[in-house]
A protein has these predicted regions:
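Sec-dependent N-terminal signal peptides
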Residues: 4-15
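Bacterial Sec-pathway N-terminal export signals of envelope proteins
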Residues: 19-68, 74, 226-268, 321, ...
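Periplasmic alpha-helical coiled-coil/stalk elements that build and connect Gram-negative outer-membrane
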Residues: 22, 26, 50, 134, ...
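A glycine-/polar-enriched beta->alpha junction
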Residues: 29-39, 46-61, 96, 103-122, ...
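Amphipathic alpha-helical coiled-coil segments
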Residues: 40-55, 137, 141-160, 171, ...
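Acidic, low-complexity, intrinsically disordered peripheral segments
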Residues: 64, 73, 414-448
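Small/polar, glycine/serine/threonine/aspartate-rich low-complexity segments that form flexible
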Residues: 66-105, 234-243, 275, 288-319, ...
Length: 448
């Protein structure tokens, strides 16, 4: 037992000390295997599938088998039965009687205004909605993991910037200290350098905290238990993506977005409910067949089933003449619900269309901004090197050095934040166009 415990602690220790590199696809696959919300969504699909199977009961006949037996006891009594033919008198004594019966009945709905058929159609639409909601859940999991992953990558990169900034500040303090001791610079230069180094230390502590929080968030979104284990997001170069045109985006939005398809399915539900309400005014026809037999005991019952059985066939037709205002009210309510679903669909589609257009424009904007930011970083790096050389020979002030250092930090941070925002917007566009979850479909899901 102690050996197993030591092995377990060793595994935790190794996992916490050795950072594991993951790309975003690996993190998403782990989340799709572990996240409990996907299990719940799958159960909803299975429940809807069972509802579809149950809806066929309205179209199929019902078969019932019944059997009964009974025995009645009462005080002994003699019954005198005169035989007028033979001029004799018979007596019968009895104190109990028994009864046994068996029957088979088949009932079938012939017509009920299309209610049974429409109930099946409604169950099919409900199953489709459950599958679309499962897609929604999967998309949300992928979005959360992607956002957390790039949040971790951003925190890693900003931590690297903070480390470089602190290193530059320490070197600057050492340089100013030597020059101050030689009398080449004033004490205010040394104080300014120390202030800059102190600010760099504070920034580094904040970045470490942000990195730890991002790590925890990613583990939670991946559905993993956080034991303090390290994880490293792989740094990859940002590559501009192709942005669909407005017409292409609208087409994908209508055909692929799960929420849009759910709204469209709701309209179909409204149509079916209206047909059901309308069919309630139609006559209903039912038919049944009954086969039965009875006897005083099991032997007589067997004989009756062979020779003395009874067969009954019946058919009933119901005409709904008047039922208050219930039928007309139900029909009007179904009609209003149908109009509401149609209005909700158009409103929802227009809202998403605007969102897609805004994201399209922002991604196109990022594709122009990021190269400019990259050039700015390169220029800031070169500027800092030149100012440091000038300061070392006394042709630049400490303020110029600090300004160049701050400019480099800001340009690096701006580039990191801009690339992060661009990746998040690209992910959001894929999600809105219904393409995000399709990228991570399993072979079984593709077959379905």
């Amino acid at each position: 037992m102690k050996f197993k415990r030591h092995i377990y602690l060793l595994i935790i220790f190794v996992s916490t000390t050795i950072a594991q590199d993951y790309d975003v696809s690996e993190c998403i696959k782990i989340a799709l295997d572990r996240k409990g919300t996907l299990v719940s969504a799958g159960l909803d699909v299975e429940s809807a599938n069972q509802g579809l199977l149950g809806s066929y009961s309205g179209l199929l006949p019902s078969l019932n088998v019944s059997t009964a037996s009974g025995k009645t006891k009462y005080p002994d009594q003699e019954i005198i039965i005169p035989d007028l033919v033979n001029l004799e008198i018979d007596t019968v004594s009895s104190g109990e009687s028994s009864y046994m019966s068996a029957g088979l009945s088949i009932n079938q709905t012939i017509y009920n205004g299309g209610k049974s058929l429409n109930t099946v159609k409604q169950a099919k639409v409900n199953l489709e909605i459950a599958k679309l909601r499962e897609r929604n859940t999967k998309t949300q999991v992928i979005q959360n993991v992607t956002s957390s992953y790039y949040g971790l990558l951003k925190a890693q990169q900003l931590l690297e910037v903070a480390l470089k900034n602190l290193s530059l500040s320490e070197k600057q303090v050492n340089l100013v200290q030597k020059q101050f001791e030689l009398g080449a610079v004033r004490k205010t230069d040394l104080l300014k350098a120390n202030v800059s180094m102190g600010q760099a230390k504070v920034e580094l502590l904040n970045r470490k905290t942000s990195l730890e929080n991002s790590r925890r968030q990613l583990f939670n979104d991946m559905g993993m238990i956080d034991f303090g284990q390290s994880i490293q997001a792989k740094n990859s170069e940002w590559i501009p993506v192709s942005v669909p045109s407005s017409a292409e985006a609208l087409g994908l939005l209508k055909e692929k977005n799960p929420n849009v398809l759910i709204q469209r399915a709701a309209i179909e539900i409204g149509n079916i409910q209206f047909k059901i309400a309308k069919g309630m005014r139609s006559p209903s026809a039912f038919a049944s067949i009954d086969y039965s037999a009875s006897g005083d005991n099991s032997e007589q019952l067997k004989e009756s089933l062979k020779d003395d059985w009874r067969l009954g066939v019946s058919m009933a037709i119901n005409f709904p003449i008047f039922s208050g205002n219930s039928l007309s009210t139900a029909q009007q309510q179904a009609k209003l619900s149908k109009r509401k679903y149609e209005n909700d669909y158009l409103t929802f589609l227009n809202d998403l269309r605007v969102q897609v257009e805004l994201i399209r424009k922002s991604i196109m904007n990022y594709s122009e901004i990021i190269p400019i930011n990259q050039d700015v970083v390169s220029a800031a790096e070169e500027d800092l090197k030149l100012v440091q050389k000038r300061y070392s020979i006394g042709s630049a002030t400490i303020l110029e050095v600090l300004d160049a250092q701050v400019s480099l930090i800001r340009s690096n941070s701006t580039l990191i934040n801009t690339v992060h925002d661009a990746r998040i917007q690209e992910m959001r566009l894929k999600a809105l166009l219904g393409m995000l979850d399709i990228e991570y479909q399993t072979k079984e899901e593709e077959i379905k």
